[in-house]
């Protein structure tokens, strides 16, 4: 006999998200999922369907919350470079002290299921496309503001997506902050952010030197 549905399905789905995020699809047994969600098998099947159906809902929930919040970060700052630094800073902090130490549910699922489940892969492709579009927007703002070279291609957004996916995989090895921040610095340097900042600094120093009044002999 199933448990009466006296629970918030969305709240319990969030627990399933965490279970799949940490252990993957194959590594999450139904008994363990029931325990993580705090419900009986009858309630799980009656509310969410079978394991695959639950997993699909968990991935969609993850993309609508964790992924969406990360993507929104890239649009919050008028400065494109500041937005990129904030995004990667949050990613590094999450890897070192949050759930990101499990990697990323999207990335993990690409590795585990993309080759054997085309329907799930299609959902993941949508998530990656949204991230790439958000990166392209930040790059465009940075380029327009002169924060990076004007000829920086918007296709660099795909490169940043690859950097993120690599960091998500690396997260499972418990990397140091120094290593993660070095990766981020290298990625931003590839966009020319450091080069433009250095040039602007030299111009500022030169301008300041030109306006300093000469001291009397």
Region annotations inferred by a language model:
Residues 1-7, 149, 195-217:
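N-terminal intrinsically disordered/low-complexity leader segments
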Residues 8-17, 33-34, 58-62, 66, ...:
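Generic hydrophobic, amphipathic alpha-helix propensity
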Residues 11, 19-53, 57:
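Helix-turn-helix
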Residues 57, 71-102, 156-160, 204:
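Hydrophobic alpha-helical connector segments
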Residues 82-85, 118-144, 155-158, 182-185:
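Amphipathic alpha-helical packing segments from all-alpha helical-bundle domains
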Residues 83, 98-119:
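Amphipathic alpha-helical segments used for helix-helix packing
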Residues 94, 141, 161-178, 190-199:
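Amphipathic C-terminal alpha-helical segment
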Residues 102, 107, 151-170, 182-190:
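Hydrophobic alpha-helical segments that form the core
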């Amino acid at each position: 006999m199933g448990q009466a549905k006296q629970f918030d399905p969305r709240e319990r789905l969030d627990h399933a998200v965490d279970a799949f995020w940490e252990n993957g699809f194959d590594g999450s047994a139904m008994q363990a999922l029931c325990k993580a969600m705090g419900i009986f098998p009858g309630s799980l099947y009656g509310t969410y369907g079978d394991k695959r159906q639950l997993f699909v809902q968990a991935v969609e929930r993850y993309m609508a919350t964790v992924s969406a919040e990360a993507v929104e970060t890239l649009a919050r700052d008028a400065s494109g470079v500041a937005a990129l630094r904030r995004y990667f800073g949050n990613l590094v902090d999450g890897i070192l002290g949050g759930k990101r130490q499990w990697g990323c549910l999207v990335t993990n699922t690409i590795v585990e299921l993309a080759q054997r489940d085309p329907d799930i892969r299609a959902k993941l492709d949508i998530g990656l496309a949204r991230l790439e579009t958000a990166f392209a927007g930040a790059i465009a703002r940075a380029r327009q503001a002169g924060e990076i070279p004007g000829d920086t291609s918007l296709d660099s957004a795909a490169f940043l997506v690859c950097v993120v996916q690599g960091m998500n995989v690396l997260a499972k090895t418990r990397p140091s902050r120094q290593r993660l921040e070095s990766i981020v610095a290298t990625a931003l340097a590839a966009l020319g952010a450091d080069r433009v900042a250095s040039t602007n600094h030299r111009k500022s120093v030169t301008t300041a030197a030109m306006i300093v009044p000469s001291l009397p002999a």
